[in-house]
Swiss-Prot record:
GO terms for molecular function: proton-transporting ATP synthase activity, rotational mechanism. Residues 22-76, 375-406 are annotated as: Disordered. It comes from Anaeromyxobacter sp. (strain Fw109-5). This is ATP synthase subunit a. It is found in: Cell inner membrane.
Length: 406
């Protein structure tokens, strides 16, 4: 898997480099229809009536400064092709790349998801002047909302399906001594429950949130690992995905706090514990506490997104040095370094899933445990009052008995 991924990245960079060179040496550009098509036809007719003038203009434009044009084109080709490959690798889109030989130099078959999930009706005039209607690829639109699945959405569907199959297959194999896949799944589930949920939320309330934490851990883990598979895509490198994962944690955290302290206690917490006698300070504490609600999901979003994007950019940058410096000797150092970063990314996939789950449980536990501590303090207060009353009554009895003894 590692070698195949690195070879795929290297081939994509080389093909992009070749495309850049082809563009520099006069590759024909695709024709694009514009509203000024009639003017173009008239200009073409004029050029046909005066071929010498058109040829002279073309020759002057083509041979104006060939050395300067070649140098600028080469530099722009290198920069644009390498940068485009790096952005294309992490960007979302409608085109899904599947393994297979589809002709030409490409080792991947490109499937346009707009052709699969949606069509668009277009009316046009044929060569005989008749109005015809045909179907072309277009977005899947409901009202004004584009609902066409992108490749990152497809990756999430595939990850969810594989996750369900793996978990159900592991759970069905019930035995006293777990082995193989069931042992591995059970180990991870027990780790999430005992080492993450219980330690951060507490034994009393942990099991209520374990299903979400386990689901988030495995879902993020599978998406991270998918990004290291050739022809796949890293959905967690899309900030829209990480935002929604953080939103789920945010909503569950608010639900846990309202369930623990009630609606009144939830809004009372916005004052930051400042008593009513110091109510002018509420104008400072309430905005601070309100912003604090959103800094936690923001941290979850940026942490996961930035780490996944950075790892892929480092690998692509190391492989891109071969083509940027135009020397095969660079591969002696860049390929082993890229391979080591790739192996590190396997570890990072688990680490980022763990960090997201751990921080989510920490945020949930901060609102649940705070309520538990308040109840505990109240119980201790009542106990201390009862104990103090008992000691007081005992002291009064002793004091009352003293004169008798005297």
């Amino acid at each position: 898997m590692t070698a195949a991924s690195l070879v795929t990245l290297a081939l994509s960079l080389s093909l992009a480099q070749a495309a850049g060179h082809a563009g520099e040496h006069g590759a024909p550009a695709p024709e694009v229809a514009t509203p000024a098509e009639g003017h173009g036809a008239r200009d073409a007719a004029g050029a046909a009536t005066d071929p010498h003038g058109a040829a002279a203009e073309h020759g002057a434009a083509a041979h104006e400064d060939p050395a300067q044009h070649g140098a600028a084109g080469a530099e722009a080709g290198h920069d644009e092709s390498l940068g485009a490959v790096m952005m294309h690798h992490v960007a979302d889109g409608y085109v899904l790349e599947l393994p297979g030989f589809c002709g030409g130099l490409s080792w991947a078959c490109h499937v346009d998801l707009r052709d699969v999930f949606g069509t668009e009706h277009v009316s046009e005039i044929d060569a005989h002047g008749h109005a015809v209607e045909r179907n072309v690829s277009g977005p899947l639109v409901f009202g004004k909302v584009d609902m066409t699945p992108t490749k990152h959405v497809v990756m999430m569907w595939i990850a969810s399906a594989i996750l369900l199959l793996v978990v159900f297959a592991a759970v069905r194999k019930k035995s006293l001594v777990p082995r193989g896949l069931y042992n591995f799944i059970e180990m991870l589930v027990q780790f999430v429950r005992n080492e993450i949920a219980v330690k951060n939320i507490g034994e009393k309330d942990a099991d209520r949130f374990v299903p979400y934490l386990v689901s988030a851990f495995f879902f993020i883990l599978f998406l991270n690992l998918f990004g290291l598979v050739p022809f796949a895509a890293t959905a967690t490198a899309n900030i829209s995905v990480t935002v929604m994962m953080a939103v789920f944690t945010f909503l569950i955290t608010q639900y846990a706090q309202i369930r623990a302290v009630g609606v009144g206690g939830y809004f009372a917490h916005m004052t930051g514990g400042v008593p009513k006698s110091l109510w002018p300070l509420w104008f400072i504490m309430i905005p601070v506490e309100f912003l604090g609600l959103f800094t936690k999901p923001f941290a979850l979003t940026v942490r996961l997104f930035a780490n996944m994007v950075a790892g892929h950019f480092v690998i692509l940058a190391l492989l891109g040095l071969i083509f940027a410096l135009n020397s095969q000797w660079i591969a002696i150092a860049s390929v082993p370094m890229a391979l080591s970063i790739y192996m590190l990314e396997l570890f990072v996939a688990f680490v980022q899933a763990y960090i997201f789950t751990m921080l989510s449980s920490l945020f949930i536990g901060s609102v649940v445990a705070h309520h538990g501590h308040e109840d505990e303090h109240e119980e201790h207060g009542h106990g201390a009052a009862a104990t103090g009353g008992a000691h007081g009554s005992h002291g009064s009895h002793v004091a009352g008995a003293s004169p008798g003894h005297g």
